[in-house]
């Protein structure tokens, strides 16, 4: 989330209100993988 790679199509919430999701990957609903470039 917030990152370029963090998008709804990627299984993550591409919303700026979820900055933690882009760094820890907790923004992903099915695949909790770390999103590069999130920090």
Swiss-Prot record:
Belongs to the natriuretic peptide family. It comes from Pseudechis australis. Pfam families: ANP (PF00212). Residues 1-8 form a propeptide. One of its GO terms (biological process) is regulation of blood pressure. Residues 1-39 are annotated as: Disordered. One of its GO terms (molecular function) is hormone activity. It is found in: Secreted. Keywords: Disulfide bond, Hypotensive agent, Secreted, Toxin, Vasoactive, Vasodilator. Expressed by the venom gland. GO terms for cellular component: extracellular region. InterPro entries: Natr_peptide. Snake venom natriuretic peptide that targets both NPR1 and NPR2. Exhibits hypotensive and vasodepressor activities. This is Natriuretic peptide PaNP-d. SMART domains: NAT_PEP. Disulfide bonds join 12-28. The lineage of its organism: Eukaryota, Metazoa, Chordata, Craniata, Vertebrata.
């Amino acid at each position: 989330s917030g990152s370029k790679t963090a998008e709804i199509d990627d299984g993550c919430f591409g919303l700026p209100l979820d900055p933690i999701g882009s760094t820890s990957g907790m923004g992903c609903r099915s695949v909790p993988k770390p999103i590069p470039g999130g920090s």
